[in-house]
A protein has these predicted regions:
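Sec-dependent signal peptide recognition
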Residues: 2-9
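N-terminal signal peptide c-region/cleavage motif recognized by signal peptidases
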Residues: 13-17
Length: 305
């Protein structure tokens, strides 16, 4: 065990004790395991991916949800195809209520040049957050049906979310909430909510009602605005993660993320480079957003981006 890793463990223990709740402790435990050697970088169609799914099944099986797998194939070259597996956790009793699809991709880059790419921020943070939300919201009363989807093969083309979104009837889905890269260590205590432009006025009361003193949710409605706020390169944030697959199928979205990460797709994307207290506060802010949606009854939301 390296000194740096030992210090990281101490940091996690201190931070989780400050929050007290067993749910918050589990959130950090999940993050730590998802970005560990045991899951070998979580690359699609590898032993690491299989180990990840086994862990996710074991966690989701503890909740009041029906857990299933969705296998899909996609082109991985001119003449080759590959297979991915999404994990879907839905209420045990289906209703006629509109669905909110909460997504996070669990795949990453695996092993390259003899080194594992652990993908702590990308996207163990999103997956651990989804597990937390599935647990904390499972017995809450909502005017909508919450469905949790852990997508595969996002890194090489959003393939898992493309397949899943195409199976949906957009008339039955209120929105997608996508969680990707929630642990960027920055000085501002802010998480960005990149949102379909059509939701700007409709979700304004929700964002206004939020009152989280540790983390501010900043609504953003264009890639240009997002790039300006985070002082990043010219990234098309509307197409940067799984939320784009839903937009392509006429389903509006809110994408929660922290912006550009200097350790993105490097071996330095580890738990040691995540601000744990800020990450936990970010997940709690997102939880607050979803709970606030329960106070607003939307019959339909247009998916124009």
């Amino acid at each position: 065990m390296t000194i740096k890793y030992f210090l990281c463990l101490i940091l996690i223990c201190v931070c989780t004790n400050s929050y007290g709740s067993a749910l918050h402790t589990q959130l950090v435990d999940d993050l730590n395991h998802l970005a560990s050697n045991a899951l070998m970088g979580r690359k699609t169609a590898t032993e690491g991916a299989a180990n990840t799914r086994a862990y996710l099944h074991s966690r989701l099986s503890k909740f009041n949800l029906n857990v299933s797998e969705q296998t899909f194939t996609y082109k991985s070259g001119i003449f080759e195809h590959a297979q991915g597996i999404n994990i879907i956790a839905a209420p045990t009793k289906s209703t006629q209520r509109k669905k909110i699809i909460i997504t996070a991709h669990y795949d990453h880059l695996g092993k390259r040049g003899g080194k594992y790419y652990f993908g702590a921020n990308d996207n163990a943070t999103g997956v651990a957050a989804l597990l937390y939300l599935a647990s904390s919201l499972q017995n809450k009363e909502f005017p909508y049906e919450l469905v949790f989807v852990l997508t595969d093969a996002e890194e090489n083309g959003l393939h898992g979310s493309k397949h899943f979104a195409q199976t949906l009837n957009s008339n039955n889905v209120l929105m997608n909430i996508n969680l990707d890269m929630l642990g960027v260590k920055k000085h501002k205590s802010r998480v960005y909510a990149l949102t379909s432009y059509s939701l700007k006025q409709k979700l304004k009361p929700v964002f206004t009602a939020l009152n989280n003193t540790k983390i501010t949710i900043k609504p953003v409605y264009s890639s240009k605005q997002m790039n300006r706020l985070i002082k990043s390169q010219n990234i098309d944030w509307h197409k940067a993660s799984d939320h784009y697959s839903f937009a392509q199928n006429n389903i509006p979205y809110v994408y929660f993320g922290m912006g550009h990460d200097p350790h993105h797709h490097t071996t330095k994307d580890t738990v040691q480079h995540i601000d744990i207290p800020k990450y936990v506060s970010t997940v709690l802010a997102i939880e607050g957003f979803i709970k606030q949606l329960a106070h607003h009854h939307y019959d339909d939301l247009n998916a124009e981006t």
